[in-house]
């Protein structure tokens, strides 16, 4: 059905030139007809089988408009044929046409490359083709721009599939030379382009040609279908679609035509040249409400005019379907596909009488794009009293399995006296594996390897720069928009706490990818007994330990590096890392048990996996390199201890305290904020068992220091000035605090409104968490001394015992002051923590 639609966009020429050329051409045609040489060039740029009176109406309007232009001819102005715009300036007129009518070509020049024939009128080119190129249908037009002049160069492509079509009627004799087809659709950048100008005829001249005109128009349209199908390329997805079977009776001149009321007030003839409307009608003649709304916005015409235009076009082309047929055709068009096979187009012109006569077969094996439904039928409607025995011309699509086979599959002919348009049966294609339809790039699922690369980049920076994006494009093969969208989604999810991307989870993903690639699955904690391998040397163990300190889950590249350096197999390396992780976890559990945990495993595992993710963080996230595996375990445990100690002191840390915790623990700030949020929720439900243990631990330390506090309280109360000096001295150097200064310091804390209190309260408040756990091996205390951080959690054992006893009495009071300050700010701090 697509072949029946043509754009009637004429070429824009100057008004004076239009009149001169029309008058000359009309005189030439009158001379030819007077000499008794009827012209067969009746292929105008209107759709096939248009009613005769509709063309006359168009001619009358054309003549009237030309008469109106006589006054403008003297002025030398330019008038637009598509809108009332007119101007005296050629540049303004050209700009108007380019902006408002982009499909219009101004003053084209037609050139026939075969004969070196040149003309400015498409009708003259059609006459030239009918005289000098009879029977040629495979014309090719090439658009060329030369010095602000548009040149359409016509050439003929060599083909072996062109067969001349002859049509015979009751009034034609045996020696009729046949009707040659010389008109092809004009193309401009893939769109149909033709000149819709019609030469006005007198009624008495047009009447004798009615019979010949109807026959010629029928055969011309059939040939144009083949010509257009032959010039279209195949779809890229190699899916064959079903084209409507076009049924046109050969005795169309004897069939009464259906009158179409084009002169109604609601019918808008401007829609006949609208490419959007024509394309929509070509796709499906029954538009939905959504399509009507879209066409209303696209064409800027009322919806009622569009409805009437569609109804008129269906009436003109004999399309009348029931609602069930419309629904079925729409389902077949948009939901069903037929396997890709080389299509064979067969045209079977039937005889005019019921007698069986051998019929010529026109077969073309042209690769083409075939669109539409198998139930679409185009035919002339016959009256009830007329009983004409005819089988219409059927354009069918036959599926062929063998690529070398070109024999047409003959469609069964229709029965005589058809009451309704017949549907050509399309042979069912052989069973074949269905082609997977292509999905958009945004709908494709990403592989595990692509996600692993994205997560690794996300850990480094949540806002990647252009260089990182280009690197990800090369590594993952994803589009830039997909990568940007993935980062945006995961930033949102991390802020809401939906997903948490850590180096530990990334390592597990890479291990799973490696296991899938090698045909086996890696288990973090395998249940089976490990296989015994040969003893490893000291150098191999040192290399493995160094790699374990960086990450307990080595990446694929790290495993390959270890294989080269240690000369061990992949299984040996994986087994060693698995055993090493089990040893680390058991030692962590032993440390928790030694601290007095009442319930086994309650400290190591928290609901929702909040604590387990922090306990299993790899050493790669820690600040600095660690000297030994035991230090890594202590440092991991130290992170948990710092967080719990801070939580026991204040449940709502300030943003500055969050930053300090992130610097001390080496954890991501979002992980720390999430940890506090989850533990506050657990505290409300009463399932936070370790909090009581930490609070008891603080209370026991404070009771041991109460004796020293009571002893020095009386002495320091007598000398408040010395207490102030001691406070300032401690602020400068905490290690230089003597016994006498500590005795003067604690009572001074009780005096309100003194700068000494602010000085002492400000100094410990900077240390919102501590590194007391690191002091168990004699290293954490040195770090605390160098950084000036006060330990509020544990009493240090060893060299620092004397100092701890000296200033332990006032540490309790300072800690209480910090807790009170944190509680007072608890109303405003949650919002800040949520934003962090």
Curated annotation (Swiss-Prot):
Start and end residues of each stretch annotated as Required for homodimerization: 195-358
Biased amino acid composition, Basic and acidic residues: 50-61, 192-214, 699-709, 730-746, 813-824
Modified residues (Phosphoserine): 824, 826
GO MF annotation list: DNA binding; protein heterodimerization activity; protein homodimerization activity; zinc ion binding
DNA-binding region per UniProt: 263-324, 439-501, 530-591, 628-690
Record's keyword terms, sorted: Differentiation, DNA-binding, Homeobox, Isopeptide bond, Metal-binding, Neurogenesis, Nucleus, Phosphoprotein, Repeat, Repressor, Transcription, Transcription regulation, Ubl conjugation, Zinc, Zinc-finger
Function statement: Acts as a transcriptional repressor. Represses the promoter activity of the CDC25C gene stimulated by NFYA. May play a role in retinal development where it regulates the composition of bipolar cell populations, by promoting differentiation of bipolar OFF-type cells. In the brain, may promote maintenance and suppress differentiation of neural progenitor cells in the developing cortex.
Protein family according to the UniProt entry: Belongs to the ZHX family.
Protein name: Zinc fingers and homeoboxes protein 2
């Amino acid at each position: 059905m697509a072949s029946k639609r043509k754009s009637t966009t004429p070429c824009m020429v100057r008004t004076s030139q239009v009149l001169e050329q029309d008058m000359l051409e009309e005189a030439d045609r009158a001379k030819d007809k007077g000499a008794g040489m009827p012209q067969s060039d009746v292929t105008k740029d209107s759709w096939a089988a248009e009613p005769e009176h509709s063309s006359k109406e168009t001619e009358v309007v054309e003549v009237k408009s030309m008469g109106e232009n006589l006054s403008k001819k003297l002025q030398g102005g330019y008038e637009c044929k598509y809108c009332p715009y007119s101007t005296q300036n050629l540049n303004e007129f050209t700009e108007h046409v380019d902006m408002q009518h982009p499909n219009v070509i101004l003053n084209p020049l037609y050139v026939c490359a075969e004969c070196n024939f040149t003309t400015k009128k498409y009708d003259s080119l059609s006459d030239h083709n009918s005289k000098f190129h009879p029977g040629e249908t495979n014309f090719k037009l090439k658009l060329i721009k030369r010095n602000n002049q548009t040149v359409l160069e016509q050439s003929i492509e060599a083909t072996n599939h062109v067969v001349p079509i002859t049509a015979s009627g009751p009034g034609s004799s045996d020696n009729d030379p046949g009707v040659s087809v010389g008109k092809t659709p004009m193309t401009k950048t893939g769109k149909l382009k033709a000149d819709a100008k019609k030469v006005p005829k007198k009624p008495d001249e047009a009447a004798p040609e009615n019979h010949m005109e109807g026959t010629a128009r029928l055969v011309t349209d059939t040939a144009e279908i083949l010509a257009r199908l032959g010039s279209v390329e195949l779809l890229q997805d190699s899916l064959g679609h079903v084209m409507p079977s076009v049924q046109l009776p050969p005795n169309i001149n004897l069939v009464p035509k259906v009158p179409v009321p084009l002169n109604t007030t609601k019918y808008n003839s401007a829609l006949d040249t609208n490419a959007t409307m024509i394309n929509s009608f070509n796709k499906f003649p029954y538009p939905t409400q959504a399509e009507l709304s879209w066409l209303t916005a696209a064409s800027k015409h009322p919806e009622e005019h569009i409805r009437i235009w569609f109804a008129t076009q269906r009436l003109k082309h004999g399309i009348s379907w029931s609602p069930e047929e419309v629904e079925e055709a729409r389902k077949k068009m948009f939901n069903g596909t037929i396997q890709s096979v080389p299509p064979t187009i067969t045209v079977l012109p039937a005889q005019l009488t019921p007698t069986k006569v051998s019929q010529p077969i026109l077969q073309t094996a042209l690769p083409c794009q075939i669109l539409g439904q198998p139930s679409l039928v185009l035919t002339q409607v016959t009256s009830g009293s007329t009983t004409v025995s005819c089988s219409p011309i059927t354009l069918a699509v036959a599926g062929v399995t063998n690529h070398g086979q070109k024999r047409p599959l003959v469609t069964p002919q229709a029965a005589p006296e058809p009451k309704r348009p017949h549907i050509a049966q399309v042979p069912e294609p052989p069973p074949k594996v269905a082609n997977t339809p292509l999905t958009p790039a945004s709908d494709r699922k990403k592989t595990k390897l692509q996600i692993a690369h994205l997560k690794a980049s996300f850990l480094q920076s949540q806002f990647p720069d252009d260089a990182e994006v280009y690197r990800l494009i090369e590594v993952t093969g994803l589009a830039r928009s997909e990568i940007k969208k993935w980062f945006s989604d995961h930033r949102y999810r991390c802020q809401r706490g939906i997903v948490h991307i850590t180096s530990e989870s990334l390592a597990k993903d890479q291990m799973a990818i490696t296991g899938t690639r090698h045909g086996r699955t890696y288990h973090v904690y395998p249940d089976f007994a490990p296989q015994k391998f040969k003893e490893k040397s000291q150098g191999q163990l040192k290399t493995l330990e160094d790699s374990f300190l960086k990450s307990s889950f080595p990446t694929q590249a790290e495993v390959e590096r270890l294989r080269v350096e240690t000369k061990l197999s992949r299984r040996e390396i994986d087994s060693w890392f698995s055993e090493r992780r089990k040893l680390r976890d058991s030692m962590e559990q032993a440390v928790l048990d030694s601290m007095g945990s009442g319930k086994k495993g309650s400290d190591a595992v928290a609901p929702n996996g909040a604590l387990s993710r922090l306990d299993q963080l790899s050493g790669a996230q820690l600040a600095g390199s660690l000297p030994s595996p035991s230090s890594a375990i202590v440092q991991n445990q130290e992170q948990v201890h710092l967080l719990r100690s801070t939580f026991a002191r204040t449940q709502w840390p300030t943003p500055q305290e969050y930053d300090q915790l992130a610097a001390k623990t080496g954890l991501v700030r979002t992980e720390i904020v999430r940890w506090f949020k989850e533990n506050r929720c657990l505290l409300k439900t009463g399932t936070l068992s370790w909090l009581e243990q930490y609070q008891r631990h603080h209370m026991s330390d404070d009771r041991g220091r109460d004796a020293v506090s009571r002893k020095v309280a009386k002495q320091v109360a007598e000398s408040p000035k010395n207490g102030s000096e001691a406070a300032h001295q401690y602020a400068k150097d905490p290690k230089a605090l003597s016994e006498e200064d500590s005795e003067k310091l604690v009572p001074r804390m009780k005096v309100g409104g003194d700068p000494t209190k602010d000085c002492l309260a400000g100094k410990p408040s900077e240390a919102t968490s501590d590194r007391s756990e690191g002091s168990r091996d004699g290293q954490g205390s040195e770090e605390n001394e160098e950084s000036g951080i006060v330990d509020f959690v544990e009493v240090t054992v060893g060299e620092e015992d004397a100092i701890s006893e000296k200033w332990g009495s006032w540490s309790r009071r300072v800690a209480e002051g910090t807790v009170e300050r944190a509680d007072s700010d608890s109303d405003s701090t949650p919002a800040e923590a949520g934003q962090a």
